[in-house]
Amino acid sequence: MSHCKFEQPRHGSLGFLPRKRASRQRGKVKAFPKDDASKPVHLTAFLGYKAGMTHIVRDLDRPGSKMHKREILEAVTVIETPPMVVVGVVGYVETPRGLRSLTTVWAEHLSEEVKRRFYKNWFKSKKKAFTKYAKKYAESTQSINRELERIKKYCSVVRVLAHTQIRKTPLAQKKAHLMEIQVNGGSVADKVEWAREHFEKTVDIKSTFEQNEMIDVIGVTRGKGNEGTTARWGTKRLPRKTHRGLRKVACIGAWHPANVQWTVARAGNAGYMHRTQLNSKIYRIGAGDDAKNASTDFDATEKRITPMGGFVRYGVVENDFVMLNGATPGPVKRVLTLRKSLLTHTSRKALEPVSLKWIDTASKFGHGRFQTPAEAKQFLGTLKKDVA
């Protein structure tokens, strides 16, 4: 085109303003799936830590597609999900202004890693959190039972307080992540009893999600610091002879009103924003104690999901994990909230059964050639370090 364009759509969406850093690193669940009393009692969300990415090979099962029954290669994300510990229950009452919490009941004993969540400086603190509350159990459980009965009588929504076991991961952080998870299925009394029975007990990922399920991933994206207008909004570079910079917006508004409108693309913070990624498919839920959690029917080699040398900047996955199709928000080590989907899925892609043929476990530090240490030893033979 040899002439100027006088009209074009704006660059960048205004629906995500303000583009500022997220207030907290853990993804917030702003809506839970609709409750169904006919189903058994179950949790609707789970927390995990992003370990890294790899790739898999599988046969596409999509009749009518040109790739039907042919091998395809896909990128996958591995999220480590140690069992979560239930430490409390919260009851919510429906009001004209929405849900309002009625009362909260905590467990008798709380671990140190979750108590750290209530202190800014654990080292200098007196560490007396929940000491008075624990006396209610020692003296009499009448007050505890009274609060639980209030939840059964007045509340319509029940959520449990559960925290991660961050000490079981390679992360250096000692402070566990705590969140409210809605309990769906059964009556309100069933939910309260389920929560009471699971006080100070663990809940694993397999009791919440299952193979081939479509879920949502909520987290905070990778932070990029301050970026210019072109990188932040995707505006067009100006011509070469433009005065005072090319990666800018040439006109930032009219003379009047005598201020810059909020819709004008400007430089500022990029990344580290709260995002909800919909419709991620679970390809595998692996057990941490399974020595063949990366093996398949096609590839019977005994190997774990951790690549040779460990996941880059993460380490070794020793707990339960979930493998999701594609990428997820945030860098490695970022805590991610996995939530059951709010939608009823009917598409062929969502209902397609997934059967993995091969999972790559080669080193991610370079061009890895070997899938297991035994394979590398067989190819390289005896090395000097083995003799010494």
UniProtKB/Swiss-Prot annotation:
Alphabetical list of PROSITE patterns matching this protein: RIBOSOMAL_L3 (PS00474)
Other facts noted in the record for this chain: There are 2 genes for uL3 in S.pombe.
UniProt-recorded Gene Ontology molecular function terms: RNA binding; structural constituent of ribosome
Gene Ontology biological process: cytoplasmic translation; translation
Organism: Schizosaccharomyces pombe (strain 972 / ATCC 24843)
Location in or out of the cell: Cytoplasm
Name the UniProt record assigns to this protein: Large ribosomal subunit protein uL3A
Transmembrane segments: none
Gene expressing this chain: rpl301
Family note: Belongs to the universal ribosomal protein uL3 family.
